[in-house]
Amino acid sequence: MKGVISQVMGPVVDVDFNDYLPKINEAIEVFFEVEGKKHKLILEVAAHLGDNRVRTIAMDMSEGLTRGLEAKALGAPISVPVGEKVLGRIFNVVGDLIDEGEGINFDKHWSIHRDPPPFEEQSTKSEIFETGIKVVDLLAPYAKGGKVGLFGGAGVGKTVIIMELIHNVAFKHSGYSVFAGVGERTREGNDLYHEMKESNVLDKVALCYGQMNEPPGARNRIALTGLTMAEYFRDEMGLDVLMFIDNIFRFSQSGAEMSALLGRIPSAVGYQPTLASEMGKFQERITSTKKGSITSVQAVYVPADDLTDPAPATVFAHLDATTVLNRSIAEKGIYPAVDPLDSTSRMLDPQILGADHYKVARGVQAVLQKYKDLQDIIAILGMDELSEEDKLTVDRARKIERFLSQPFFVAEVFTGSPGKYVSLDENIAGFKGILEGKYDHLPEAAFYMVGNIDEALAKAEKLKA
């Protein structure tokens, strides 16, 4: 099972074997020294070149590797720790702890390359995954075991929404979450860890990081590492798990780098020829089974804001819902800055939600759309030139806009107001009341940063006083 390194080209390493040929995706271990420090490097077999030579992708920096070093085939793919012991810890792509905490003996390891659940084991029920976030549950609800795309520029609140979802899943559904940091900034990973620690959600989440400074192999496979941990919670413990991927674009980007290094002919815009099949293979593993579910929230970076770029376009094909964050909403001080007209969900269907929820959601969107259409007139002529009916629409739209804001548990530190979880029934009842004109007499300010409608009424009383 021992071989010898015959060529090193950055993250691509060729290994020669005598009487053994490792399978594709098998892990190979190399020990070497750099300036007196010992290093262990894991390689993953990507191609067979003939004559018992394999081409592999390095899962860590390959500086210091030399030809002639001994490499040992491990006889199996990369396997990572799974089970409740992984909660509250940070792992790298090969399942090593990187949080400088105390070591643990993990009793269970699973391979990161797994088949999706067989067709007959998958669940076909369409159920809503209640998040407790008003704007999401009302207008673009998440499917249990579905995939959600989270779109937004820098600094509009993607990470805060992710943390709030982790919090709500932990405290309301007593479920676990897995966070895979795929090719993002190390600083963000560090901040997320400390923010989670401060907001007491760390012991309900496993973190897997393969950051921007790492070679493409690590950035690509880290998504599989996180998914494997989530699959264990679903299949062996029967839980509904939340899986966060930040950022799914980097998964495709690192795949393109690996493909070029392996000498494959690129396809459109320089991406790998296997872009769609790699993405499909990954996304098919994220699903509901009869035992449990994995609901995934995937942050999507859109290169140069071009939605037709092959990487984001391939992701769209798999999404059940999109949550779009808008800077202009954040600038108004309305958080979460979710765009109620741009966010979509296949769950927004009377067959799934029931007539009442569907009617209220569509009513809210209609009022907000009308307000958007009237904004030019208001800017030029002012409110006084509008008809009485339009004035009422604008008044209700502004209340709805403010009522879509909500204080978050994980943001209590900055906002000073206690977080609120709003159940679906309270959520629908509140917006239904606004649409029916029950609260036309209340001031706009009463609806800002409150949970359910009772809190808005209480706030209105306070404002009167």
Curated annotation (Swiss-Prot):
This enzyme's EC code(s): 7.1.2.2
GO CC field: plasma membrane; proton-transporting ATP synthase complex
GO molecular function: ATP binding; ATP hydrolysis activity; proton-transporting ATP synthase activity, rotational mechanism
Alphabetized UniProt keyword annotations: ATP synthesis, ATP-binding, Cell inner membrane, Cell membrane, CF(1), Hydrogen ion transport, Ion transport, Membrane, Nucleotide-binding, Translocase, Transport
Source species, domain of life: Bacteria
Record localization: Cell inner membrane
Cysteine pairings via disulfide bonds: none
Chief site of localization: membrane
Membership in a protein family: Belongs to the ATPase alpha/beta chains family.
HAMAP family recorded: ATP_synth_beta_bact (MF_01347)
Protein name according to UniProt: ATP synthase subunit beta
